[in-house]
Amino acid sequence: MARHHQPRKGSVAFSPRKRAARETPRVKSWPQVDEPGLLALAGYKAGMTHVMMVDNQKNSPTEGMEVSTPVTILEVPPLTVMAVRTYEKTSRGLKTLGEVLATETKDDLRRKLTPPADDYDQEAAIEKIRSNMEYVADVRVIVHTNPRLASVPKKKPEVFECGLGGKTPEEKFEYALEILGKDVRASEIFSEGAFVDAIAVTKGKGFQGPVKRWGIRIQYGKAARSSKGRHIGSLGPWTPSRTMWTVPQAGQMGYHRRTEYNKQILKIGDASEADLVNPDGGFVRYGLVRNDYVMIKGSVPGPTKRLVVLRKAIRAAGKQEEAPQINYISTASKQGV
C-alpha cells in the first residue's frame, strides 16, 4: 500500500550549502563558566585509531565491560595569547571597547599580521580599560596556533578569538592579563573525561548531484532507463512561477563549518607519550605526532591536517565527566586500510 506521508529529503536547516568563508572556524557562542580559564583549544586532526576501554557509562548495556571504541587523535601545540579584547553592550549587540596587545610576539606571527609597533604603550591601554571597567560586558582573548611544532606543512599560524571563564568581567580581565603573551597547553584547559564541542570545516566533496547531496530517491522504471534517473521528479508547481530555494538540486557539497556536540576526551598526552598513539609508519597523510595530543571518543569533522577547535561543552547538562580506563591503544599501521 502506498504511504500517505513522506518527509522531504534532506534538511534545509543548513541552507545555503555553500563553501565556508574561511578554514579557521569562528566560535559563535560560549558557555558560562565560573572558573577563570580559556574555554577553547585548537588542534590539528592527525587521524583515527581504536582503543579497548572499560565502559563506565551508567545504565549502559556494556557497563563495566571492555569494549572497542574508535577514537580521533588531535595534535595540540600550545596556544599563544597575543591580545586581550573587551566588549561593551549596545542596542546593536556587543561592540569592541578596547584591546591590550602583547609586546613580545613570535616570529611566525609576522606571516599572518603586523605586530605592535615598538612605541606601543601597553600600560596606557590597560589603564584605559580599567578606567572604563563599569562599561565592560565581556572579556575575551585573541590567540594564535603554533603549526611549526606540529606535523602539518605550514608555518603561518591561525588566529581566532577565545572566550574566558570567570564570574565577573573584572575577574576575566585580570586573568587575561596574567596569560597575555604566554603559551597555554591543553592540560591547563581540559581534563581527561571532560566533554567538548568539536567545531571545524568538513571535508570538501565538490559539485555533487541531488541524490548524494540531498538523499532523494533514484527514479524507477522507464525514467531511470532513460539516463535521467538521478534527478528530482519536479522543480515545483506551475504557480508560483519560480523555483523555490527548498528544491533539492545539485551543487556544492562539503567544506561547511559544522559543530558536533558532546565529544568526550579520553586522554590528554604530552610529547613524551606520543609513541603511545603513533601507528607504525605514522598517520596516513599526516605523519607522526610530535607534540601534545588529545584523544577524542568518536569522530570529528574535517580531513587530516584540518584545524579543529574544541570548545567546552555548551550542552553538557547531566553528562558524566569521568575518564574511562583504557587498556589498549592500537598502533597498527594504517597504510592501505
Swiss-Prot record:
Gene Ontology biological-process annotations: translation
Entry keywords, A to Z: Ribonucleoprotein, Ribosomal protein, RNA-binding, rRNA-binding
Annotated region (Disordered), positions in chain: 1-29
GO CC list: cytosolic large ribosomal subunit
Family annotation (InterPro entries): L3_arc_euk (IPR045077), Ribosomal_L3_dom_3_arc_sf (IPR044892), Ribosomal_uL3 (IPR000597), Ribosomal_uL3_arc (IPR019928), Ribosomal_uL3_CS (IPR019926), Transl_B-barrel_sf (IPR009000)
Gene Ontology molecular function, alphabetical: rRNA binding; structural constituent of ribosome
Top-level taxon: Archaea
SUPFAM superfamilies to which the protein is assigned, alphabetical: Translation proteins
Coiled coil segments of this chain: none
Pfam families from the UniProt entry: Ribosomal_L3
PROSITE patterns, per the entry: RIBOSOMAL_L3 (PS00474)
Subunit description: Part of the 50S ribosomal subunit. Forms a cluster with proteins L14 and L24e.
Family per similarity comment: Belongs to the universal ribosomal protein uL3 family.
Functional description taken from the UniProt entry: One of the primary rRNA binding proteins, it binds directly near the 3'-end of the 23S rRNA, where it nucleates assembly of the 50S subunit.
UniProt-recorded name of the protein: Large ribosomal subunit protein uL3
The organism of origin for this protein: Methanothermobacter thermautotrophicus (strain ATCC 29096 / DSM 1053 / JCM 10044 / NBRC 100330 / Delta H) (Methanobacterium thermoautotrophicum)
Gene: rpl3
